[in-house]
């Protein structure tokens, strides 16, 4: 009996010892004793949360947790007491988007055979292997940059210097994010102590991460990137269904493949895991919101720094924003003329940048701050001070460092505020508080362990101040003058503190005041009357009424109400325009445009990219829209490029300058897609490295079309069988979905084409599949096969007078448009150029010059005919009752060489007025001159240097994604117009 009791006692003792944990273990001889686990920080100002502060308060920590916080708390007898009467204590700061490069997974050198079956996804014959971009070895997704199964927690091994730098800024924890790819993998939330990784990881899989950026192989465009994300989530949904079906009946069906990438997306699909999207630009931020809602995701967004451009769109995103504080700084330029090449947009970005965080909070959005994108983290507090000076309130800033990131990272029950039971992470600041520029972070506490960030000066450091002055070891002259006293000691020269204080005050005052205006201030409709009467004009209706002299047009509620010779009954709010001596015409339509496309016109990696969508990357911010309005253009067909036989889906827009991407889109338009023939698609001039992708010959192109149409038909058959029999649905394939719409007649083909023989072969392939081609684009040899084109029912959207600019257009002639028109082909003229799109009316006039097309018919080449080709003539293209009131007012005939577009209206709203355009240019020129003056003054006060100066000045010269492809003339408008105002 006694033996049994003894065993029970021993067992109890062992259990008790084990329950004490590592902190109570007796260390072996020679180890430094562990510090006490109980601490009392006494006499500090303590922020329990961003809006509640206690003075002369005490915070008690025990065994890594907060035990108590409040006034008049006695320090426990077993506590080490830390006097903190000159300190402010905050909940430990949290970086919600922490980049540490050492977490990148290794690159794989394994390869796989890219040839797959007929209905393959991206594995077309001869395309560049994804393996060169693969970072996750082993099983995974077909696109190498999709690695949701990558886990930061697996490879977390931060450099000690990185942790130290973050602690010096007051950060105690952070969410470490993966750094590469599109769907990048899961982040890990960690404490920023020096303890082993196993001890500091608080959440192993915090978020899933997506970056909207292009890659070395497919996808190489932003629209391709979005297509990859869309397809990956569709595949994940199918994968979940397929795996569940197999688990239910493993002996009755074929085993599905295991895919760790798709498996890792399951928690995202059921909203158990939040997705953090890094879009890279303001419009991609807008697209991130649309994409996340389309996919049904819980999401947050990493700010690009350009949200100031469209706060209205950011408000509609309606998600938390993680905001980096990487701000551009004004440089000192070596020559005064160098400022001529600095655009207004670059100056605006510099002046707005510090206000970005405050602006997002003003939209009612949650904001967390991060050190992400800073090449030198030391500038974080300086940039935070600038953000505070520009409207970010201190409680909001404190929330952005504590409660908001804690909530966003799912750790608010353990971090973010100072209250009993939470992890003992604290940030201790000397002086009046963290947001004072001169205050120092004294120490941080992580898991109840103190880390000194301002160590006391060592005796050796003191002695160094009294050593003899010596030249720098490099032999260069010291930048700081040495003054030697009688004792032979080096003495630091005195600085005139009053001068320094004056300069600092002047700089602060300059930086607080924003000079830059919002881009939207000079955009949008100039007039929005309920009704408009244009009277006594020569009206080119482009409809059955033809050309009317001294006629009237009445517009009501954005629609054409009456056209002709009538006595109008006007309401009191009708705007009357006397157009005596002027010409009124429908708004011009460009049937082939690449004007407003973000992140690449081509997804040229694969021979078929029917899954990519121009609608995902419409650029509403480009100044090209304003310039084209000045030429009378009101509608454009935005097309994918011609790098592959089957390109991406088109998007038809109205030039409602000032609206966002969704506001530009003409939603009544039928869906369309770009196809292409000729040299481009067979990679004739792509260089010796691009000679393997099928097709490589002209005869291979029709074969490829037959292959993809057949694949689409098989895909449709598979879905039809599923609807009859049930079971697991087929995998959604967005390429074949789009091609199936062509077979169904609900998506129109717009095909880049030059040679007559290729055009004929293409039409025959389409006819075998009962597909009618909507337009043959460029169609320079269309005059050779005009009868066949007319019989098929295709339109011809031509270049006017382009010929002999490459071998396959050697037989092009400027009479092609008129010749095809005479043979019954519906002909339009297009630009294929943002510059040419500003003068489509002169392109129409070439139809008169080359081929003697009657003037009213020639004008239809850029109005009614392209509307018919695009399937939108029910709404636009002519001035007829019931159609949209899209019209232009001209000084002379719209086909005259000396005509000037005076006004452009869309849906009864005036978007361009020549008189306003001159005022606008003057206003923008003055704004630019004022910004240059401010930048020069700031640069002179800062010396153009300091911590992080090189990176910040590089950022100053970067151009926004939305502005990368502006015409040179746009830069003239922004940089050189009215230079005397400088």
Task: Describe every region a protein language model picked out.
Residues 44, 407, 419-462, 537, ...:
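C-terminal cap of metal-dependent C-N hydrolases
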Residues 71, 93, 103-108, 186-189, ...:
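Short, solvent-exposed loop/turn and secondary-structure capping segments
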Residues 44, 64, 86, 97, ...:
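Divalent metal-coordination and catalytic microenvironments
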Residues 132, 274, 320-430, 518, ...:
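His/Asp/Glu-enriched, well-ordered alpha-helical/loop segment
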Residues 156-299, 303-308, 440, 446, ...:
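Polyanionic/metal-chelating signatures
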Residues 25-37, 46, 50-92, 102, ...:
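Histidine-rich, glycine-flanked metal-binding segment
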Residues 7-18, 22:
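Bacterial N-terminal signal peptides
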